[in-house]
Amino acid sequence: SYDLAVADNLRVQFAEIGQLNPDRETILTYIDDPKWSMVGKAVYQMHCTSCHGANGEGKIGPNLTDNLWKNVKVVEDIAKVVSEGAAGNAMPSWKTRLHPNEIVLVASYVASLRGTLPAGTGKIIPGEVPIPHWGEPPATEQAPADAVGSQESK
């Protein structure tokens, strides 16, 4: 069937990146990756829009585009909530329905939605609190050893 063909293709593609860890560094690394962010977006569109909206604005589930979060304090918490669920199963666990890499990639996509809707729009959930910025993805290149200025002085 088509679904099996898509699943087989995804497994072949995942062989390129191996098993992804649902940690801060990995999630931030894949936020801006053109190929893999599309996989995260596809997972989101297939499984998340009915509760969180097409743009993450929130419907039944919370707004994912603002700085107010209830079950997430750091970026890796997104993968944990996707995997384990939250709010007494209002947010279901996806760990038995998604490949572990899909969980990491959808977490990266959800993290990328932050700040994409104008302030004051989207659904507000009682108990949400402001959280710090996710931070920057890890550097992909090492600075030359003879670079002007040292990292310690910054």
Spans of model-derived segments:
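Electrostatic cytochrome c docking/interface patches
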Residues: L10-V43, A139-K154
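Sec-exported extracytoplasmic/periplasmic mature domains
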Residues: Q45, T49, G53, S83-A87, ...
